[in-house]
Amino acid sequence: MLTDNKPVGCRSVVAFLLSCIFLTGFIGLSSANAAEYSYQGTEPCSSIQQLSFDSTAANASITWQTDLGPRLPGSNASAELRNSITENLTAFNFEESSHFRENFTLTNLIGTYSPKNSTGQNVVFVAHYDSRYIAERDYNESKRNQPIDGANDGASGVAVLIELGKIIPNLQLNHDVTLFFTDAEDQGITGGFHPLTWSYGAYAWVENLTEDYKDNISAYIVIDMIGDAYLDFTKIKDTSAELWETVTPIAAALGMMESELDCEGNYGRAIYDPTKTRGVIDDHVPANNAGIPAINFIDINYGENASTFGGHWHTHNDTADKVSAESLGYIGDLLELGLITSAWILVPTDSNDNANTVDQDESVLLQHDNAVEDVEKNRFVGYISIILVSIILVLILIADISLKL
C-alpha cells in the first residue's frame, strides 16, 4: 500500500504522460505499417486496340503439349515441356524448384520478368503443367487407371501463359511479372475428402516464400481449365474480393458479360458471371491462406451443357479437339488488358487525385515514393516517442530510489 500522497499524485501524472506518449508512438508505428492501398486500373476500352495475344498459337501449343504424352511429375514429358518454356521465354529469369511428396518428386518452374524501372510489385500468373494420372470419371471403366491427355485441364493454362510471356516484354510495364508453372496440382487422391493431396506444387512454393516476397505480390492469378469451347466462369470462394472487382470492367469491355455493354456498345456473351460464386480446391488456396491476394479463372463445367465437375473433366475425352482458340483468346486478352491498364497493381488510396494529373507510369512511381516517405516519417515519430518513454522510465526509477533513501 502507498502511504505517501505526494508520490502517488506525481506518479499518476507521469503514468498519464506515459500513456499519451506510448499511444503516439504506437499510432506512428501502426500508421507506418498499415498504409491503405487499392487497385485502380485505367479505363480498359481506351487500351483494347493494343491487344496482341495470339490465340491461334496458344491453341497449337495445346496440341504440341498433349503430343508429348502425360506430363506426370518426374516424367520425360514434363522435363521436355519445362525446357521448351525456358527456351521460348528468354526475357524471363527462370528457376526450377523440386520437392519430394509421398512417392514422387515434383518440379515447379518459376520465371520472372523484371523491367529496369520496376517498382518491385509483382503480378504472379499461375497454371499447373501436370496432367491427371488417372481418368477416374471416364465412362470406360477399363481405362480409368490410365493417365489422360489433359488438353484443357493442364495444357490450356500453360498455353495461355506461354503466349502471354512472349508479349509481356513489349507492354512497357513498371512492375515485375512472374509466370508460375506448378507441378502436381492434379495428382490428388479421389474418394473421400483429401484436399491436401492436391496443389502440391503451389503449397511447396508458398511455404518457401519470404515475408518480403509475399508482401510484394500485388496479385496472384490462377488460370485453369479455360480452353473449353463452351467457356464460362464465375467468382471462386476463398479468393480476394478486391481483385474480382478489377475483373468486371475488363471482362465487360471484352464482351464476356451478357448483362454489360462492350467497347462497341453491344451486350456481351455469357462467359463471366460475377453474381455467382463456386467452390473449388485449386492452386489459389495456399496463396489465399498465406494472405496473398488471389483469384482463379477456372471453368468447372467442361463441355456443352456439362454439369459442375462433369462433362469431359478427368476423362479421356479431355483432348485437344475439345479446346477452342476463341476461348483461349478471351482469357489471354483478359490477362493482357489487365496488365496494360495496371488493374492488378496496388497504389495508395489517398493518392487517387495524383493519378489523374500525371502520366500513368510516373504516377505509380511517385505514389510509391511518397508512400515510402510517409512510412519513414511515421516510423521516426514512433521511435522518438519510445525513446522518450525509456528516458522517463529511467527518471522515475531514479526518483523512486531517491525517495526510498
For each predicted feature, which ranges?
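Secretory targeting signatures
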Residues: 1-40, 351-358, 362-405
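N-terminal capping segment at the start of a domain
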Residues: 35-82, 305-322
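A non-catalytic alpha/beta surface segment that caps or lines the substrate-entry region
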Residues: 47, 60-118, 268
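Catalytic-core environment of secreted peptidases
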Residues: 55-61, 66-67, 92, 107-182, ...
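Extracytoplasmic/secreted proteins, especially bacterial periplasmic and envelope-associated proteins
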Residues: 57-67, 76-88, 93, 156-163, ...
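Solvent-exposed loop/turn segments at secondary-structure junctions
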Residues: 71-73, 100-104, 116-118, 129-133, ...
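Active-site-adjacent substrate-binding region
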Residues: 226-350, 358-359, 366-367
